[in-house]
Swiss-Prot record:
List of residues that carry Cysteine amide: 17
Family: Belongs to the conotoxin A superfamily.
Function (record text): Alpha-conotoxins act on postsynaptic membranes, they bind to the nicotinic acetylcholine receptors (nAChR) and thus inhibit them.
Taxonomy of the source species: Eukaryota, Metazoa, Spiralia, Lophotrochozoa, Mollusca
Keyword hit for Ribosomal protein: no
Designated name of the protein: Alpha-conotoxin-like AnIC
Provenance organism: Conus anemone
InterPro entries: Conotoxin_a-typ_CS
One GO MF term: ion channel regulator activity
Amino acid sequence: GGCCSHPACFASNPDYC
């Protein structure tokens, strides 16, 4: 969930997931 579900967010925060 969270950033991991949003490609743009995941792209700028890869280590969050």
